[in-house]
Every structure is written in C-alpha cells, then in structure tokens.
Amino acid sequence: MIPRVFILLTLVALFCACSTLAAVSHIEVDCIPAFTVYLLYGFVTLTLICSLITVVIAFIQCIDWVCVRFAYLRHHPQYRDRTIAELLRIL
C-alpha cells in the first residue's frame, strides 16, 4: 500500500495551485495599482513554483519507495525480516 503522505502532499500542492489560479482569474488588473499587480503576480508565481516543487519531491519519494519495495521483495525469503518490512511500510 502506498503511504498516504505521497497522496496528501500531491493533493495539497495541487489544491494550492488551483485555488491561487482561481483567485487570480477574477481580478481586474485595470482597477489595481501597478505595484499591487506585480506583487500579486509574484505571489502567484511563487505559489505555483512551490507547488510544482512539492509535486516533484512527492513523485521522487514515491519512486524511491517503489524501488526499495522491489529490492526488498527480490531477496530470498530467508533473508527477509518482518520488523524491517514494517518499519519501511513494505508489507
């Protein structure tokens, strides 16, 4: 079973990105001073970059978890330790 942290991190990052884009899509730029617009778009860019980095980190962690699980299950059964498997959340 895939740990819930991977799914949670991905969902939080996607929620932040989508909510930021939804909030910005309703703003009329003509009514706001230039500095505020630049500040707002800077915040949107920062939020999207952080969300993208979070998704990439969660994806790399998921790949690492799959590789560790594959390497552990490839060993001969007599060398498998149940406590290590529970610690790594493999079984």
Curated annotation (Swiss-Prot):
InterPro entries (UniProt xref): Adeno_E3B
Sequence ranges on the Lumenal membrane side: 23-34
Signal peptide from the UniProt entry: 1-22
Record membrane topology: Single-pass type I membrane protein
Record field: transmembrane: 35-60
UniProt keyword list: Early protein, Host endoplasmic reticulum, Host membrane, Membrane, Signal, Transmembrane, Transmembrane helix
GO CC list: host cell endoplasmic reticulum membrane; membrane
Cytoplasmic topological domain: 61-91
Subcellular location: Host endoplasmic reticulum membrane
Homology family: Belongs to the adenoviridae E3B family.
Biological function: Down-regulates the EGF receptor.
Protein name: Early E3B 10.4 kDa protein
UniProt source species: Human adenovirus C serotype 5 (HAdV-5)
